[in-house]
Each structure stands twice: as structure tokens, then as C-alpha cells.
Design a protein with these regions (language model features):
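Conserved catalytic core of the tyrosine transesterase superfamily
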Residues: 1-329
Length: 329
């Protein structure tokens, strides 16, 4: 059945890059999966990683590795499923080259993803979003950069990776102002900008031209801010904003929260889910439907729109004390 080393070398140097055109982030995630998996197999079989054979991999080994990730490394369900996808991808790639191993590969590819609890989606209200922006000091270069960056994030809903990869040339602030980015799956898209965002970015861009590098939001040396740096800057400003906006106290806010915030604004305005999916760069409308479950006010509004003509608007509140007690359970 052959050694694993040449299989992995061909997969990562040729197939993933040339045939699949995977993004750098996906390749790194898959690479890290196989580094962990090989170390796990090597420890279990007492065979050095470079000497492992395809025959050393069984469905039971894969399941044991996934359980090890959850129990030993405290990884969540999402990480477990990502690691499983990386293993399946390599196995599927090699299936046509190892016909005598097809049954085992099929059993590995049949291992189901694990369902986990879906966390409550977090987003900012309009007041909280404004409090966040107002809390960012603009008496320093970094403060002005951060305000421009998070103004863009809240209005456009760009992903963190999309924000950090933006170049100054990606901004088009003339007629029909927009920002161009390369999103998930290397898909290019353009996102229109509001007048307020355009004005903020035009002011920022004028100052940005005096700085080195081409990144739209650079660090001190002109290189693009890292994802961790952006999250840390956001954390600092959220903490400051919480002093004037109690709703932010204890709320875990990330750049993805700002993406959710942009989506919820559209939903509250009655924009169709298909349009929101296009705006956010979602491949499927099903991905966007998660926002429909996020806001209780939207649910109440939907209930009011569908009530019987002779029914009053609002939620049902039982008058009977026993019913009230049962409802409170």
C-alpha cells in the first residue's frame, strides 16, 4: 500500500495548491492536522512518522485520534470536524491510487461529523456599535486607524482575514464607492460603502499615504496587522466603551461579532436573506438563515405580522397563576 510520506508530499505540493487551489489558511490547517495525526499514530504504533505506511491508518485509528483531540487536547467539536475533513481529503485524494485500500478509505470517509451545541450568536445593537466607535480615541495615529478599520468592519461585515489582507489600492472612494476583497475560498467580491464610511476612510487614507507599506491597516513597520493584533485592539476599545454602554459589559466581542452586527442591521431593515448572503460572501443562503434566529425582536415582529385579525399584538402572558408558574419553569 506504500508509505505515507510521498502521498502527503504529492497532496500538499501539487494537488492542494494546483488542482484544488486551496487557500493558504486551509493548507496550513490541513498540514497541522496531519502533523498531529502522524504524531498520534507514531506514538500508538511505535513507528517513526516518516516510516508510517498507509496500512497503519484504520477507521478506528481516526476515531481514536478525534477522541484524543477532544479529551486530551480539549479541542471543541468544530476543531474535531475540521481535523476529520483534513484526513478525509487526503484519503479521498489517494483512493484512485490504492485500489486495494478502497474499502478502508470508504469507511474512513463515512465517519460522520460530530454535532455540537450551537452557541448563542452575539451581535451589537446600534447603540453599542456607536458606543464602540465613539470610545476609540482619535488623538493618535493608531486610534484613527482603528476607528477607520472598525467603522469599515461594522458597515461591511468583512471577515477578519479579509480585513487584514486589504491593500490601500482595494479602496475605491470615488463614485459608487466600494471596497474589493478576496474572501473565503479565494472568491473576489466588492462591497459598497456608505457615505459615512467613505468619508471616514477618505480622511484616514489621506493620512495613510504618509506611512510605509501597502497594507490598508498597517502596524508600526508598515506590514499588515495580524489577526491577533486586530482582535486585541478591538478588545481594548470594547473595554473602554463598556464604561458608557452597560450592554457591552461582559460581552465577548470579536471581529466576527461585527460581521454579525452588519448582517443583523440588514435583517432588521427587512433585506432578503439571499441579498444578505451575497453581501457577506456566503456560498449558501442556509448559512445566512442563522441570523433569523438571533433577535427576539424580529421574532416578535414576525408573530405580530401573522396574528389573527382580532388578536392583539404582543406576546402571550397567562393570567392563571398555575399557568404562569408552569410557564416560568
Amino acid at each position: 500500500m506504500g508509505p505515507l510520506a510521498p502521498i502527503l508530499q504529492e497532496y500538499f505540493t501539487a494537488y492542494a495548491v494546483t488542482q484544488r487551489a486551496m487557500s493558504g489558511a486551509t493548507i496550513r490547517a490541513y498540514r497541522d492536522t496531519w502533523r498531529l495525526f502522524l504524531a498520534f499514530l507514531s506514538n500508538a504504533t511505535q513507528v517513526p512518522a516518516h516510516q508510517l505506511q498507509l496500512a497503519h491508518i484504520t477507521p478506528a485509528d481516526v476515531v481514536a485520534f478525534l477522541d484524543h483531540l477532544e479529551r486530551g487536547r480539549r479541542n471543541g467539536v468544530a476543531t474535531r470536524n475540521l481535523r476529520l475533513a483534513a484526513i478525509k481529503s487526503v484519503m479521498a485524494f489517494h483512493a484512485s491510487k490504492s485500489p486495494d485500500y478502497l474499502e478502508v478509505i470508504a469507511r474512513i470517509n463515512a465517519i460522520p461529523v460530530k454535532k455540537g451545541p450551537k452557541p448563542q450568536m452575539t451581535f451589537l445593537t446600534g447603540a453599542e456599535a456607536q458606543a464602540l466607535l465613539d470610545a476609540i480615541p482619535t488623538d493618535t495615529w493608531t486610534g484613527r486607524r482603528d476607528r477607520a478599520m472598525f467603522t469599515l468592519a461594522i458597515q461591511t461585515g468583512l471577515r477578519l482575514s479579509e480585513i487584514t489582507s486589504l491593500q490601500a489600492a482595494d479602496l475605491h472612494l470615488g463614485a459608487a464607492a466600494h471596497v474589493a476583497c478576496t474572501g473565503k475560498g479565494r472568491k473576489n467580491r466588492t462591497t459598497p460603502l456608505t457615505i459615512a464610511t467613505t468619508t471616514a476612510l477618505r480622511t484616514y487614507l489621506h493620512e495613510r499615504t504618509t506611512r510605509p507599506g501597502h497594507a490598508l491597516f498597517p502596524g508600526p513597520r508598515g506590514d499588515a496587522l495580524s489577526a491577533d493584533a486586530v482582535q486585541q485592539r478591538l478588545k481594548v476599545h470594547v473595554t473602554r466603551a463598556a464604561a458608557s454602554s452597560p450592554g457591552l459589559v461582559g460581552k465577548h466581542v470579536t471581529v466576527h461579532t461585527l460581521r454579525h452586527t452588519a448582517a443583523m442591521r440588514f435583517l432588521e431593515a427587512g433585506i432578503d436573506s439571499a441579498v444578505i448572503a451575497l453581501w457577506l460572501g456566503h456560498e449558501s443562503i442556509a448559512t445566512t438563515s442563522v441570523y433569523l434566529h438571533a433577535d427576539m425582536n424580529l421574532k416578535r415582529a414576525a408573530l405580530d405580522r401573522t396574528r389573527q385579525p382580532d388578536s392583539p399584538a404582543g406576546d402571550y402572558h397567562p393570567d392563571d397563576p398555575l399557568l404562569a408558574w408552569l410557564q416560568s419553569l
